[in-house]
């Protein structure tokens, strides 16, 4: 009995200490068509100082697998499951990292290509700007650009110059 009380005491203490600790900011970057050796932090001769700084001060993946289809890798990164386990592009099984972080009172946002079912705001992201299609012109856009669920028209010019 004393052992049980002792364990419960330290468990409660650990939870108390953990709740007082400052939560980390989480920035997760996934880039299509970026090879393993394209960043300086992975040994490339290409200089990528800002990404190298993020990698040096944070967590970086050193063992990962990328499928030949971009949506499969995105589904796995979002859910921690194999693409088929998560329901493929439908994401109808399991929870996304945005849903889990949202339950922990994190603010979640996604910027860029979605190329999965529905919209990112349907899967836990509180804010979204990007395009829903698999590929588009960032100069002319298409009808799938969204800002928080609303259709977004890509401007033809910015400050009088081509955008």
What are these regions (language model features)?
Residues 4-14:
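Sec-dependent N-terminal signal peptides
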Residues 2, 18-163:
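Formylglycine-dependent sulfatase
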């Amino acid at each position: 009995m004393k052992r049980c009380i002792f364990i419960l005491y330290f468990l409660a203490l650990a939870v108390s200490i953990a709740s007082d600790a400052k939560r980390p900011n989480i920035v997760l970057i996934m880039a299509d068509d970026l090879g393993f050796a394209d960043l300086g932090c992975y040994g490339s001769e290409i200089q990528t100082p800002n990404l190298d700084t993020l990698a040096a001060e944070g967590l970086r993946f050193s063992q990962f697998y990328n499928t030949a289809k971009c949506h499969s890798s995105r589904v796995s990164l979002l859910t921690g499951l194999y693409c088929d386990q998560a329901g493929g592009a439908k994401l109808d099984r399991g929870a996304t990292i945005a849903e889990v972080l949202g339950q922990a009172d994190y603010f979640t946002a996604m910027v860029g290509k979605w190329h999965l079912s529905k919209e990112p705001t349907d899967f836990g992201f509180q804010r979204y700007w990007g395009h829903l299609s698999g590929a588009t012109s960032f100069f002319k856009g298409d009808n799938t650009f969204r800002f928080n669920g609303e259709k977004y028209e890509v401007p033809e010019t910015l400050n009088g110059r081509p955008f």
